[in-house]
Each structure stands twice: as structure tokens, then as C-alpha cells.
Amino acid sequence: MCSSDLEGAPDVPNGTNLAVDVKGDPTFYSGRVLDNAGKPLANALLDIWSGDGEGNYDMQMPGEVGMKARGRIRTDAQGRYWFRSIRPEYYPVPTDGPVGRMLSAMGRHPYRPGHIHMIVSADGYEPVTTHIFAAGSKYLDSDAVFGVKESLVAKYDKHPAGKGPNGEAMDTPFYTVEYDFRLRPARSKAA
């Protein structure tokens, strides 16, 4: 994906379900955005996107589906964020071009483990573009693009149908994930 594929994601409040009409297991994400010293960063921006429960991004879905599993959320005064989406599943990178040919020549598979993408930013701090990978996802140890780091793998706790963390009645099992982000101060610009 390139930046033009991501532009225009809606600004939504904390607690929003980003996965309305998206296939996949419901998942509640929460955590904080902190500085290196552990100070919460209020009003930090999380630009979030993921595929559906079958590994398809909205631009890969048939028809005009609009933006799905995407949104921009700001942290609260304590640096907290929370939203609902889906538990990401593994998927293949395109194999019909040079990357596919390279992977084939190397004897490597084209799969990425399940992950959700985020660009996390705050005024005065270096932005970070990253993923949260689902612990236990297939291909964690052999990601086609070598993007997995242990620090980016999060536990997805499974819960039976019942009351979700937002008070919503869930008629299917759901997951919860807690993950904190740390941002470095921006480098000062030389005069």
C-alpha cells in the first residue's frame, strides 16, 4: 500500500467500531501512547487500517465498498486509545509481479502473518509507522517481508460471547488486545 491508498481515512472518536460490515472475529483494541519516559501523550493520532478476517484490504474487495477497517483516532488526556476492529488473519503479498518472482526464486512463500497497521504521531515527537502482529498467527517466524519483531507481537485474548469491554452485548466470541506505543522526541532542526 502507498500513501494514496491510505489518505482520507475518517477521524472518529475513541470506541468506534472500525469494522462495520467487515468479515472477521470482533476484537477490542486498547492501550496508551507514551513518550520514552512513560509520560502519556494526550491528543496523539493513531491512523489505523487492516484487512478483513480473510486478509483482504478494502481496495481488494469486489465492488465499491468504500473505506473499511480504517480510521483516525486521537488519544484522551491520559494518552489512552480504544477501538473495535477484527482479529487480523494472514494473507499473501501479490505474486504476479517482481516481488512474487523474487520470492519464488528464493524458494520463499508469499505470506504475511495477521497484523493491523498504524501510524502513530504526536506534536513534538517522531511519528512511527508500524504493525501489531497477532500472537499465534501462522507465518510469524517467516514473514515474507521480514516485518515481525518480538516487540510487535501482541496477545489476543479470546472471550466467550457476552458483554464486551465497551458494554456491548456480543453474540459471538471476541478478542481483546492491549498495546502501548512509545514515541521519541522529534529531533530539533538545525538553524
Regions found by a protein language model. Name each.
Residues 4-191:
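Beta-strand-dominated extracellular/periplasmic modules and repeats
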